């Protein structure tokens, strides 16, 4: 998005312009600002962004409406089965992304039947614990807080990462080429993140969940386990706003990591594409 000027006689006329790609075409939209750039240009820019995303927001709202309609029709027993299935798939994928050796079927055996495969005990315990934290998370309708995030982390890792479980780091960390913020800044960074998460009327919840996930991973508040907590946080926001959740699949981990290593806007575009690819298909089925 950029501000440009055009000459009209001796006068300059200012416009706010945005170009984006749609398929193979480049679409350009613009609005007239006046003979000078208004003082409230930031507000105008945000309103312009929202107007450009009108179709997107309508589609996301349709996904939410269809999901809620279907969910309300389901008997409680069917809902519980569905949540257990989501728990299995989500737990398998989120742990596999972080290097777990547990397969999808082994995750099912652990979660449903309490049967432990011949795999590292750490992976078995983290599968069991993550599933329980996820299902308990869905029962919570409260605001996001440091206490909540620390509890999730502690409950998942208190038997496998005892020295760091349930605590924010107090030492520097590096993830590949990325150097996380100084640990002394974590308190303030997390306060800003949590305040944004809980702010009312804070734009579309699907976009918010992506932004919060991205910023959480950049803060990297824990010594380890940030990806799993970040993906729980992402789905907590979606679920409590009435939207279907999103599973970042292990098979798509490369594009996911690539998006996380980019800037926030690029990650948001990636996230929205994935969300619409998964839930947009279900949206189309309801029309047929």
Which residues does each predicted region cover?
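FIC/Doc superfamily catalytic core
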Residues: 1-224, 228-288
């Amino acid at each position: 998005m950029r501000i440009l000027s055009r000459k009209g006689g001796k006068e300059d006329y200012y416009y706010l312009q945005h170009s984006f790609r749609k398929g193979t075409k480049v679409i350009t939209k613009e609005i007239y600002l006046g003979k000078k750039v208004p003082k409230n240009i930031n507000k105008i820019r945000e309103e312009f962004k929202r107007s450009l995303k009108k179709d997107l927001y309508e589609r996301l709202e349709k996904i939410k409406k269809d999901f809620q309609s279907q969910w309300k029709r389901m008997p409680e027993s069917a809902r519980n089965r569905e949540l257990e299935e989501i728990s299995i798939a989500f737990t398998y994928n989120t742990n596999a992304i972080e290097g777990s050796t547990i397969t999808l079927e082994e995750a099912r055996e652990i979660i449903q039947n309490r049967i432990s495969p011949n795999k590292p005990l750490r992976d078995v315990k983290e599968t069991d614990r993550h599933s329980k934290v996820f299902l308990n998370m869905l029962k919570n309708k409260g605001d996001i807080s440091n206490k909540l995030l620390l509890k999730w982390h502690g409950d998942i890792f208190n038997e496998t990462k005892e020295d760091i479980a349930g605590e924010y780091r107090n030492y520097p960390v590096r993830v590949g080429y990325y150097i996380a913020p100084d640990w002394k800044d974590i308190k303030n960074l997390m306060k800003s993140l949590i305040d944004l998460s809980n702010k009312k009327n804070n734009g579309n919840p699907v976009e918010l969940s992506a932004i919060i996930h991205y910023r959480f991973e950049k803060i990297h508040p824990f010594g380890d386990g940030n990806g799993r907590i970040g993906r729980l946080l992402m789905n907590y926001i979606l679920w409590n706003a009435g939207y279907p959740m999103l599973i970042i699949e292990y098979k798509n981990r490369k594009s996911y990591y690539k998006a996380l290593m980019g800037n926030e806007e690029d990650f948001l575009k990636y996230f929205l594409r994935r969300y619409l690819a998964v839930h947009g298909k279900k949206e189309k089925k309801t029309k047929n």
